[in-house]
Amino acid sequence: MRLVLIIVALVVLSGLVLVQYNQVEGASNEISANVQEANVEAYGTEGFAKADKVIEFEFPADHGPHPDFQTEWWYYTGNLGDADGHRYGYQFTIFRRAILPGEPERTSEWATRQIYFAHFTVTDATGETFEAHERFSRAAAGLAGAQGLPTYHVWLDDWDAREIEPGKVQLQASYGDIGIDLILEQTKPAALQGDRGLSAKSDEVGNASYYYSLTNNT
């Protein structure tokens, strides 16, 4: 049976986090860490923007990509319950990673300096099962990408987060007989981490990220 979790009138604790930064501070799992470490060793971080000062966020534009930065991600997690009392959790993340700064020199539909990778997990807390899947793609030929305007959309193949109306985002991802199809409605203003969204990792200038959360979506 295909598991599809749809928010209708459920109590949901969910959030979106967007982070963009140019320094490698670690990663969410071994595979993504290996990708980042390989990129840094081969190409370094020279030429990319740094999170080195407080900025004024502009939404919805800042929900979209910031290609001057080497890395950013769109991160969703939530807890769900159904009418029978079953409990579920989910996580859906799309990462963008630049290999080199700037635009590719050659003109081709396939040319890119950006790669995207996505993680998708579902936990059946009641049934004590866990599913985890991932995908990788280049940001070319429509295979993967992100935009903030005119409407927010980030995707990798048919896994995506898409604004369907102001303040509402639909998440869709599936693998085999496991999938999510969720509609999240923003209920609170963005929570800015650190100093008005500038989250320092150390005392070194530029060793920081721009980081905000949209919490308590329903």
How should each PLM-predicted stretch be described?
Residues 1-218:
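Targeting-peptide/extracellular-domain and disordered-appendage signature
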